[in-house]
């Protein structure tokens, strides 16, 4: 909670809050329209802009409360993660341990203590709600139970387009721990069961999510290119991009185990 005493910094927070006159005006009709149409900061994330506007509307420029909003979402995300894991495997203590590591791991400091990274905790919040809704849906597949998944997924991508892989994550969850691919009946930690759908259905039911993900990828790529955030293949050849991805994966896995030499610039 020491972040409540932190001030604004001039690293992206200026563009997201205190030098952005749309955000500084709070929640206004003009600001809401701007949030849904702007490509400012090389991103299209209207929900994130609305979140910052709401902070200003409620707290003005009291930086501690803006930090507190990040802490709030991170805390809720921790509880959601615990609930989802416990719901899937019925292991309370193991789920609690994973959630605790998620809550306090140093790799999350940047997302929580940096006001400009509101988009990170906000996107995770809606993404976890989408996964939680999916667990409810698979017990009894109906349109009424599917819509919340789609809505939360869209809101997550409108906060930050980092969960475009969610349809694949749900397929992985189908395989394990839900075992929708292997058994005639689905078992849940509360003792309930439901009939296993066909493998084709598992793909078909996620087509709307794949479509949303594809649209988000196209929008993001276009916006990032226009903002100069994506280098050309001539500047960064494909083989260098592949090597960079592999090194990045190895680096992040290593820092998950031993989080040293962390820096804001990544």
Positions of PLM-derived features:
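Polytopic membrane enzymes that build or remodel cell-surface glycoconjugates and lipids
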Residues: 1-266
């Amino acid at each position: 909670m020491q972040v409540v005493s932190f001030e604004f910094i001039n690293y992206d927070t200026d563009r997201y809050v205190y030098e952005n006159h749309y955000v500084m005006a709070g929640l206004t009709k003009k600001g809401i329209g701007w949030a849904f149409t702007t490509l400012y900061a090389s991103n299209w994330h209207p929900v994130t802009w609305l979140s910052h506007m709401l902070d200003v509307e409620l707290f003005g420029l009291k930086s501690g409360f803006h930090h507190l909003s990040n802490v709030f979402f991170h805390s809720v995300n921790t509880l959601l993660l615990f609930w989802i894991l416990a719901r899937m495997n019925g292991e309370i203590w193991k789920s609690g341990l994973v959630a605790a590591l998620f809550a306090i791991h140093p790799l999350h400091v940047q997302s929580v203590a940096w006001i400009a990274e509101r988009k990170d905790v906000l996107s995770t919040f809606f993404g976890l709600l989408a996964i939680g809704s999916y667990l409810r849906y698979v017990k009894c597949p109906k349109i009424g139970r599917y819509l919340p998944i789609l809505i939360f997924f869209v809101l997550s991508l409108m906060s930050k387009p980092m969960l475009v892989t969610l349809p694949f994550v749900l397929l992985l969850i189908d395989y394990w721990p839900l075992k929708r691919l292997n058994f005639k009946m689905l078992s849940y930690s509360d003792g309930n069961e439901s009939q296993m759908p066909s493998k084709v259905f598992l793909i078909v039911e996620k087509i709307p999510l794949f479509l949303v993900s594809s649209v988000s990828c196209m929008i993001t790529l276009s916006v990032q290119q226009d903002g100069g955030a994506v280098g050309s293949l001539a500047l960064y050849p494909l083989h260098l991009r592949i090597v960079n991805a592999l090194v990045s994966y190895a680096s992040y896995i290593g820092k998950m185990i031993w989080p040293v030499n962390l820096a804001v610039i990544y």
